Design a protein with these regions (language model features):
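Hydrophobic/aromatic residues positioned on beta-strands within the core alpha/beta folds
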Residues: 80-82
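Receiver (REC) domain active-site loop signature in two-component systems and cognate sites
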Residues: 56
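Acidic, metal-coordinating helix/loop segments flanking the phosphotransfer/catalytic sites
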Residues: 31-49, 110
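Two-component/phosphorelay signaling modules centered on CheY-like receiver
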Residues: 12-30
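C-terminal output helix
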Residues: 104-119
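Active-site residues of response regulator receiver
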Residues: 53
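His-Asp phosphorelay/catalytic-motif detector in bacterial-type signaling
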Residues: 46-48, 73-78
Length: 123
């Protein structure tokens, strides 16, 4: 069975990098550019994993996670948070995400580890 991922990031480069990484590992991938768009996509798809940026226009990653946790149909989706070091300054750690990836460190290596942690499976 093919796993489905939803990648949410306003940076085209990051979105492309993460989507390509997942597609190369057999995932079906959908993407959105912000939290509002992601919530719309989630009306149509049911991903096995959601990977979201922390800082985005319209609705940021923290707000998106809050919305996801409110609804039984999305509350159990494993979440990997993409964050720049600057987005963490002055904010508590995002304890509602299953893993965090720092954008300024090797994303591919971190993605492999985060997927293993969030899904408990080999990548």
């Amino acid at each position: 069975m093919t796993r489905m991922a939803l990648v949410v990031d306003d940076s085209m480069l990051i979105r492309h990098t993460v989507c390509r990484f997942l597609e190369e590992r057999g995932y079906a991938v959908e993407s959105a550019t912000n939290g509002v768009d992601a919530l719309e996509r989630l009306k149509e798809i049911h991903p096995d994993i959601l990977i979201t940026d922390m800082m985005m226009p319209k609705m940021d990653g923290s707000q998106l996670i809050t919305e996801l946790k409110k609804h039984p149909s999305t509350a159990r989706i494993p979440i990997i948070l993409l964050a720049g070091r600057q987005s963490a300054v002055g904010r508590p750690p995002e304890c509602r995400a299953d893993a965090t990836i720092w954008k300024d460190i090797d994303i591919v290596t971190q993605l492999e580890k985060a997927l293993q942690k969030a899904l408990g499976a080999e990548v």
